[in-house]
Amino acid sequence: MSSELNIPVDPSTPAVSERGNKGMDYRDWVRRSYLELVTSNHHSVQALSWRKLYLSRAKLKASSRTSALLSGFAMVAMVEVQLEMKYGYPQLLLIAFSACTTVLVAVHLFALLISTCILPNVEAVSNIHNLNSVNESPHDRMHPYIELAWGFSTALGILLFLAEVVLLCWIKFLPIDSALTRNETATTQKPRGNAGWNSALVSTIIMVPVGIIFVIFTIHFYRTLVRHKTERHHQEIEELHKLKVQLDGHDRGINVV
């Protein structure tokens, strides 16, 4: 009787059943992790799309404000500038001032046109509190135009504005020499005739380094931004590679089980 009760049990049987239970739990865990990964990737794509939308909206707003301000200043400067009829301006100076003002206004109005056309559509989508509504925004399709408006308004537009300031200084200060020469006829002092020229030259000397610094800063900012995006893409690729290695290891474990 005791021999019947003390039946030897194969020690591998509970281990196999326990391993099978563990294998099923492990498969469920991998399946659940995969579903969570897919869900998180979906939300990550949605978050990236919303980030691009908000960035495009911010660029369009900044472009429209900057373009409206600088183009208005250029128009007022061209209208309000008073030319001395008795002074013989250099022909190249007048041509440069006219061309710079016209190009400045045209560039900023073009950027303002792009911002005015695209911004309402982006604003309408950004005010909808729905994750899937980001696909209705035209910011991805209009991305080249948004970048063009941003570049015209900030980079090219500001450089033209600096050139406009220099040309205005030359136009306003050059006639001072002839006015001083006419006023010095009643005095015994020798007329200098260099005040206007020196004033315009000083403004040019100051503005040239400012323009160079602006160009260097623009290039440095662009390179830094590109480097940051590249590093972020490398990090995302490394994270995806790690996830792939982990999933491959899990699949091998499941196959072994």
Swiss-Prot record:
GO terms for biological process: store-operated calcium entry. One of its GO terms (cellular component) is membrane. It is a multi-pass membrane protein. The keyword Transmembrane helix applies. Pfam families: Orai-1. It is found in: Membrane. One of its GO terms (molecular function) is store-operated calcium channel activity. Keywords: Membrane, Transmembrane, Transmembrane helix. The keyword DNA repair does not apply. The chain crosses the membrane at residues 62-79, 94-114, 156-176, 201-221. Its main location: membrane. Belongs to the Orai family. PANTHER family: CALCIUM RELEASE-ACTIVATED CALCIUM CHANNEL PROTEIN 1 (PTHR31501), PROTEIN ORAI-2 (PTHR31501:SF5). Ca(2+) release-activated Ca(2+)-like (CRAC-like) channel subunit which mediates Ca(2+) influx and increase in Ca(2+)-selective current by synergy with the Ca(2+) sensor, stim1. This is Protein orai-2. It comes from Xenopus laevis (African clawed frog).
